């Protein structure tokens, strides 16, 4: 097993650890951290959001350990780096080091435990091609149940009169709403039903090939994952842009092992991912509005296509408008991870002695384009004209589409050298 900066026989390891093979987590989940839930003892994964492309979980090993940050140290192929964007089909094994004896070699960085990921190497033999394809249907784990409009108005009136205040809704208003005869002036809207779909599809595909001979071996893979969003969208807008939260990710990997001599092994690994996320122009404000909008203030849209302004006594914006009419955000993330290692046996000095040097170079570039607009809004009066038409009052003018953009980037370098001694003397083993 992989322990600290080296590999060790499992029987010789006294530290607490758990191991997992990739065959145990074959599933269409886009988040590798979430896929670990329930598969490794002592590992807790807390998902902060289910938004496509942002659904990575916080991992705790044996609970919350340190006050500021309880995420464990993550090691991929010997280099400290995150692993959530790695395709599960590229992973050979995952090892979790839990207690102090297992993580001591990492010092304070291993205080919250260590997660060690080893990707697949090349194998000796004829080329072997594997193709995996998965589909899944994602649903909300739990949705809050809100009161309908009639219950809401009666409860609001009861709360006000209990405090000695005047009721907010007149009996005639409640009666007109209950009749459903004029839903534009007396709406009763289930905003969750208007905005949210029953579920969304996730698709994941992986193509990999491995092979090689006694001198050189290789593993190469390509993968793609597509997460659809859970919002209902305005079909009229889709011809121009998509406001539904969604995520697409492309991954590639090349691992090669080359025996330069009988005692010298060179390993080269190059991998990367390109992720595109889509979101409404107002982003997180959609959920704030959805959870706070009462059902009787405004309709979704007027019959003439006018967008309703704020409801009476309610300063929150129409959640459907925020999700479908305010433009969109496009976020791109490009990662490249490389590592080169040299393993040299030094048996000519003493049997069992070896040297290993490793260099890693990672780049992470992030760019975001925001194209945001606000539509013109109207307020319908509480009476109709002589011909039965609605009377409108303009409440805000249209703000045309504006574009802003930003980009950031970082690079990380990793260098280490290890001298190991591993030898057996009859029934005794040193290493």
Show where each model-derived region lies.
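Short, intrinsically disordered, charge-balanced linker/junction segments flanking boundaries
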Residues: 1, 417, 421-431
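Short, small/polar-rich motifs associated with maturation and membrane association
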Residues: 1-252, 266
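Extended hydrophobic secondary-structure segments that form protein cores and membrane-embedded regions
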Residues: 75, 132, 354-363, 431
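Flexible, solvent-exposed coil segments and beta strand-coil junctions
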Residues: 96, 179-190, 228-238, 312-324, ...
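Short loop/turn motifs that connect adjacent beta-strands in outer-membrane beta-barrel proteins
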Residues: 122-127, 214-215, 230, 263, ...
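Flexible loop and strand-edge segments within Gram-negative outer membrane beta-barrel domains
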Residues: 140-142, 189-223, 227-231, 243-317, ...
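Flexible, surface-exposed loop regions and adjacent strand-edge segments
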Residues: 146-152, 236-242, 283-293, 371-381, ...
């Amino acid at each position: 097993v992989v322990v600290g900066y080296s590999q060790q026989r499992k029987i010789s390891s006294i530290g607490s650890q758990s191991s997992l093979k990739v065959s145990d987590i074959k599933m269409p989940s886009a988040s590798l951290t979430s896929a670990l839930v329930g598969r490794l003892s002592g590992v807790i994964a807390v998902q902060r959001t289910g938004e496509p492309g942002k659904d990575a979980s916080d991992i705790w090993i044996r609970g919350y350990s340190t006050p500021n940050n309880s995420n464990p140290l993550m090691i991929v192929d010997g280099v400290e780096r995150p692993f959530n964007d790695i395709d599960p089909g590229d992973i050979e094994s995952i090892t979790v080091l839990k207690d102090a004896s297992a993580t001591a070699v990492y010092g304070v960085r291993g205080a919250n435990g260590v997660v060690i990921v080893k990707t697949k190497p090349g194998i000796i033999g004829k080329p072997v091609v594997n193709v995996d394809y998965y589909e899944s249907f994602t649903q909300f784990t739990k949705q809050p149940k809100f009161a309908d409009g009639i219950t809401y108005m009666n409860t609001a009136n009861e709360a006000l009169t209990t405090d000695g205040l005047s009721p907010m809704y007149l009996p005639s208003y409640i009666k007109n709403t209950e009749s459903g005869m004029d839903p534009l002036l007396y709406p009763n809207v289930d905003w969750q039903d208007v905005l949210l779909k029953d579920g969304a599809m996730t698709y994941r595909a992986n193509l990999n090939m491995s092979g090689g001979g006694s001198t050189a071996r290789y593993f190469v893979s390509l993968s793609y994952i597509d997460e659809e969003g859970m919002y209902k969208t305005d079909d009229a807008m889709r011809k121009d842009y998509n406001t539904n939260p969604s995520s697409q990710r492309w991954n590639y990997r090349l691992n090669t092992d080359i025996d330069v001599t009988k005692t010298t092994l060179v390993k080269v690994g190059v991998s990367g991912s390109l992720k595109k996320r889509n979101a409404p122009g107002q982003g997180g404000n959609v959920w704030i509005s959805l959870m706070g909008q009462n059902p009787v203030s405004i309709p979704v849209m007027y019959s003439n296509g006018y967008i309703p302004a704020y409801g009476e006594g309610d300063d929150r914006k129409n959640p459907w408008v925020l999700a479908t009419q305010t433009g969109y955000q496009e976020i791109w993330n490009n990662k490249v991870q490389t590592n080169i290692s040299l393993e040299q046996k030094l048996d000519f000095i003493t049997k069992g002695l070896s040297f290993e040097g490793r260099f890693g170079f990672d780049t992470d570039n992030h760019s975001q384009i925001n194209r945001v607009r606000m539509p013109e809004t109207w307020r319908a009066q509480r009476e109709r004209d002589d011909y039965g038409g609605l009377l409108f009052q303009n409440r805000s003018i249209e703000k045309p589409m504006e574009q802003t953009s930003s980009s950031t980037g970082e690079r990380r370098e990793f260098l280490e050298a290890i001298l190991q001694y591993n030898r057996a003397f009859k029934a005794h083993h040193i290493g």
